[in-house]
Amino acid sequence: MDRTLSPATLKTELADNLILDVRRATDRDASTEQLPGANWKDPEKLADWADGLPKDQDIVLYCVRGGSVSNSVVGALQAKGLKARFIEGGIEGWKAAGGEVVAK
């Protein structure tokens, strides 16, 4: 399975995915917005929540810019057999592509 998903592709599939915000707590706290329907999960506590995710649903996650945080979380989730990908460019790439954000 690919590790990334383009913002353009996600726009057509948004409703079909479980959306996870995995920005570090300080980055999330500094922001006023998130993707619609996103649930925040602390990437530092991945071991506490990863096993509770559905194995039969596509999972899309994002951090600030789609870098090391998203990449490491996707790697860990895929290693557990989950269908996880991250948004290329993170929430910043999503917004730059005209993706909708909402107040958190």
Pin down the residues of each PLM region.
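Rhodanese-like catalytic fold shared by cysteine-dependent sulfurtransferases
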Residues: 1-18, 24-60, 65-104
